[in-house]
């Protein structure tokens, strides 16, 4: 904004309540996984997005194919919608040809941030994350990256594509992630496999990421920036 118009601005990032870890309803989350036919020994690779071409979900399909283990299941949390179904149909066919067990959740998810809005929906993303083993987020571009922040909040390892906003605003914070540059390499697949098979390494990774996010994307950060903005606009400090 400053470069194009000369107007200064303050960027308020997406935030989550990192001061308080997520409250997990074990009965609810177990019921969710059972409802889509998964077993306890299945390794759940979760793509927590809608099926849209810019999400680059074909890379997640390729990842599961190259991990080459029948225990690995790819779960996409939202169906296609207003953007059309051509990509979704192609993606499902591609997964079938590659021998990837792909599950697309076709129930409407309630908003975990507004639980009273959609009371008829019995599940939300907060039921998905707790038992996920790995998160894929190979988006081509994003405004910010809600799924990235949610994965960190639930202490899940993830694969992320280095889209422009990530490179500019998130990567400099020093998160410990498995990153790809527009395509999946054997080295990247090996890193994913190592994380999935090494609990100690995985725990160190996700705990480090949680601590970093708490410093930069917590409610405390939001409160601080709002106080600064109020002081700038009105000369007061709340």
Cite the ranges covered by each PLM segment:
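Carbohydrate-associated surface elements
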Residues: 15
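A short helix/loop element that forms part of the nucleotide-sugar donor recognition site in Leloir-type
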Residues: 22-38, 90
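Conserved donor-binding/catalytic core segment of Leloir-type glycosyltransferases
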Residues: 34, 39-55, 61-64, 74-75
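Nucleotide-activated donor-binding/catalytic signature segment of Leloir-type glycosyltransferases, i.e.
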Residues: 85-127
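A short hydrophobic beta-strand element within the catalytic core of glycosyltransferases
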Residues: 135-136
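Aromatic "clamp/platform" in nucleotide-sugar-dependent glycosyltransferases that forms part
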Residues: 140
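A charged, aromatic-enriched C-terminal amphipathic alpha-helix characteristic of glycosyltransferases
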Residues: 197-231
